[in-house]
Amino acid sequence: MAQNDSQEFAELWEKNLIIQPPGGGSCWDIINDEEYLPGSFDPNFFENVLEEQPQPSTLPPTSTVPETSDYPGDHGFRLRFPQSGTAKSVTCTYSPDLNKLFCQLAKTCPVQMVVDVAPPQGSVVRATAIYKKSEHVAEVVRRCPHHERTPDGDNLAPAGHLIRVEGNQRANYREDNITLRHSVFVPYEAPQLGAEWTTVLLNYMCNSSCMGGMNRRPILTIITLETQEGQLLGRRSFEVRVCACPGRDRKTEESNFKKDQETKTMAKTTTGTKRSLVKESSSATLRPEGSKKAKGSSSDEEIFTLQVRGRERYEILKKLNDSLELSDVVPASDAEKYRQKFMTKNKKENRESSEPKQGKKLMVKDEGRSDSD
């Protein structure tokens, strides 16, 4: 049987199934011969392929350290949070003073997105978590090993991702090929009729105090509005703390924040007062002696008003002011004569008051002692 097969193969080989071109040319000549090509074949097909140059990627380069500053962009992108108090029963609350979100593990956190101008069709909203402090910002924020092994039920998101999107089946979870950072994005949806914002529900799947995870290191959540190709249209960020009692922690941190602000304000006021006093003392020290005004004279014509509490003080200050006004009017020579006359009159009155009346002799202490002796 095998021998018959080999004979048939040899006969086929001898017949040479490859079509030989007329004239004994090469088989490649058939390709160049238009007789053997279909009528729809484009002879410039390969030239067009070679002339096409590779186009650069429209995706922006990935940054090792993501930017956290607010960027509303041309569309006026910004965030809002529902108002909530500091009661112990709240599961999610936002502090405008701190720009910080306090929430419980795996609880719903509504984030409202507002734009002034609608973004292009197909735009997406992305949420990324990074560490706030510079010494930790290069590390990837991920769940602790304990919560990572805990089944979540839906299995839609990778186990290591901290941020989840609730109630949206179109959420896409990504891990960057270069930085390995985790992010989740959803298609941007225009606000519903009568509403000004679009709401996205976020879940944080690990506590801030978990060992092996965030380990009490503060984190930021960056919300970006991007085109379908990854071009940035807007960016906002806020701090997040995942804890057991969000209301209590918010109240405590806001109280500490206000105390720090008051301390800084008092320190600035004290520093400014000290600087002004030092400046005045230095200017007084550097002032030449010749610039000092002579006592008893005043060439300043500016008038001031002084408010005094109490009639007695007013009379004293009035007499003092009248004396100063009189000294400015009376010449110095006449003032000296009046002063001498006043002193002489006072001495005479003192001498008369010291003499005893009705001829009685004033007993001196030493004289009385000598008589007794």
Curated annotation (Swiss-Prot):
Multifunctional transcription factor that induces cell cycle arrest, DNA repair or apoptosis upon binding to its target DNA sequence. Acts as a tumor suppressor in many tumor types; induces growth arrest or apoptosis depending on the physiological circumstances and cell type. Negatively regulates cell division by controlling expression of a set of genes required for this process. One of the activated genes is an inhibitor of cyclin-dependent kinases. Apoptosis induction seems to be mediated either by stimulation of bax and fas antigen expression, or by repression of Bcl-2 expression. Disruption phenotype: Morpholino knockdowns show a decrease in apoptosis in response to UV irradiation during late blastula stage embryos (4hpf). Loss of mdm2 transcription increase in response to UV irradiation. No effect on expression of perp in the eyes, midbrain and gut at 36 hpf. Decrease in endothelial cell apoptosis in the absence of blood flow. In double morpholino knockdown of tp53 and yju2, tp53 deficiency rescues animals from developmental neurodegeneration observed on yju2 mutants and radiosensitivity. Residues 52-69 have a biased composition (Low complexity). InterPro entries: p53-like_TF_DNA-bd_sf (IPR008967), p53/RUNT-type_TF_DNA-bd_sf (IPR012346), p53_DNA-bd (IPR011615), p53_tetramer_sf (IPR036674), p53_tetrameristn (IPR010991), p53_tumour_suppressor (IPR002117). The N-terminal and C-terminal disordered regions undergo liquid-liquid phase separation (LLPS) following homotetramerization and activation. Post-translational modifications, such as phosphorylation or lactylation affect the ability to undergo LLPS. The nuclear export signal acts as a transcriptional repression domain. The TADI and TADII motifs (residues 17 to 25 and 48 to 56) correspond both to 9aaTAD motifs which are transactivation domains present in a large number of yeast and animal transcription factors. CDD domains: P53. Belongs to the p53 family. GO terms for molecular function: DNA-binding transcription factor activity; DNA-binding transcription factor activity, RNA polymerase II-specific; metal ion binding; molecular condensate scaffold activity; promoter-specific chromatin binding; RNA polymerase II cis-regulatory region sequence-specific DNA binding; sequence-specific DNA binding. A motif (Bipartite nuclear localization signal) lies at residues 274-296. Binds 1 zinc ion per subunit. This is Cellular tumor antigen p53. The record marks K88 as: Interaction with DNA. The gene is tp53. A motif (Nuclear export signal) lies at residues 315-326. Its cofactor is Zn(2+). It comes from Danio rerio.
